[in-house]
Curated annotation (Swiss-Prot):
Origin organism lineage: Bacteria, Bacillati, Actinomycetota, Actinomycetes, Mycobacteriales
Organism: Nocardia farcinica (strain IFM 10152)
Entry's family note: Belongs to the nitrobindin family.
Full protein name: Peroxynitrite isomerase
Renumbered ranges of motif GXWXGXG: 25-31
E.C. designation(s): 5.99.-.-
Keywords annotated in UniProt: Heme, Iron, Isomerase, Metal-binding
Length: 168
């Protein structure tokens, strides 16, 4: 079986998530990260949104160092739309973090926007202390821009990542 985040063109998109169709596919691009406790860095990223014909999208994210020398981060999960203007992002990180975020969905002027705040952060006994996350996505045509805010290791909710990706 292929990775669940890959688009499933032979299966009809569930009507509850039809508004999220602009996200479908694989997106690649570059980003920049910063945080008060680390040196700033650049990275390459790939995000894939797919579907299984159910009322959610699958989500798979991978990043590598800008020079391609090493993997940096990964996330896997699901994007749900339980109400027309409300979205939920449920993610697992290999660092021992799980993340449930909820937020708003706005579609206007040819753009899809999602703004999330974490409602629950779970962590294993060995994971770093992350207490809050926030994400914003903007999709216009074949471009997706996102930013991520994080409260971790004693720092308040602070800008951490931003990237611009293009659909393959």
């Amino acid at each position: 079986m292929s990775a669940v985040a890959e688009p499933q063109p032979s299966v009809a998109l569930h009507p509850d998530i039809a508004a999220l169709a602009p996200l479908l596919g694989t997106w690649r691009g570059a980003g920049h990260g910063q945080y008060p406790t680390i040196e700033s860095f650049d990275y390459h990223e790939e995000i894939s949104f797919g579907h299984l014909g159910r009322p959610f999208l699958t989500y798979r994210q991978r990043t590598r160092a800008a020079d391609g020398s090493r993997p940096m981060h990964a996330e896997t999960g699901y994007l749900r739309r339980p109400r027309p203007d409300h979205v939920e992002l449920i993610l697992a990180h290999p660092t021992g973090i799980t993340e449930i975020c909820e937020g708003s969905l706005t579609i206007a002027d040819g753009e899809l926007r999602m703004d999330f705040d974490s409602t629950h952060i779970g962590r294993s006994s060995t994971a770093k202390l992350v207490t809050a996350l926030g994400r914003s996505f903007r999709v216009a045509g074949d471009t997706i821009e996102y930013s991520l805010r994080m409260a971790a290791v004693g720092e308040p909710l602070t800008h951490h990542l931003a990237a611009t990706l293009r659909r393959d």
